[in-house]
Amino acid sequence: MFGTPRPRYAIYTPCFTPAGPAVFGRDRDSSRQLWSAEEGYPGDPAYRDFYRDIGFDLSLEDLRGVLPADGSRKFTGLKYHRITGRTHEKGLYNRGWAMGAADAHAGHFMSSRRDQIANLRGHMNVDPIVVSPFDAELFGHWWFEGPEFLNLFIRKSVFDQSAFRFTTPTSYLAEHETHQLLIPSPSSWGHKGYWEVWLDQSNGWIYPHLHTAARRMTEMARAHRDTKAEMLDRALRQMARELLLAQSSDWAFLMKTGTANQYAAKRTRDHILRFTRLYDQVRAEDVDPAFLQNCEWRDNIFPSLNWRHYV
């Protein structure tokens, strides 16, 4: 929305960036219908209540053999209650009611997208695209009936209307090759749309370390771009893995929310420390095979990662 120059069609067509990649805007209307704590579908009284779990509801005697040996309570996944409303007195979960709500919400979501796209077409001379990305954990984890909602929404959209069809960003670009060129404005889908979730007093300490590691990754990639040595190649690949894992936005997010502060801080430190040790070894061209193998055993994400991208 705030790119330079401003996008002609707002968030409803992609734009190309000077570096080449296309950017798509996240649709706010469809996002609000699923994510909003006040008006989103997942808060319907008929749906299963995520927080009411027998691990906290039942007596320790009833939970013998289910909880840890020390008796500490935890989520078990067995939840007998529905959301009901803003009350501690929760009604029992009724699967039929929940499926009825999912069906109604799927129909409403379908008709909302149909009307939205019809309205957009009346103001645009190109095909609009509505991009609706969501965290996968919303469907089934936080919103137990979420997978059924998706199933019903897709079926209704295919069989009950013809105003829109499903596509992917890649397919849309293949069908529509010409787009506006702009420089995107920094933004996120976090609180207020910018960076305050990932950069404040709770997590700001990580960024000097991440920036140093990023510079060092580029330094070593350029210094050894032509290497044929297997050990150096493996070490540089593992450095790239450790850097990517340290840069995961989950760690800063968890530090901000406080839900797993110590774990998130430890993960960040561990990846940075392993990266730094590998950096020192690569710089000296003296890689410790045992240490490298241990790092690869711990984290082997992206087995074919090309560290030369950092050149």
Question: Residue locations for each model-derived region?
Answer:
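Active-site and substrate-binding clefts of carbohydrate-active enzymes
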Residues: G3-V311
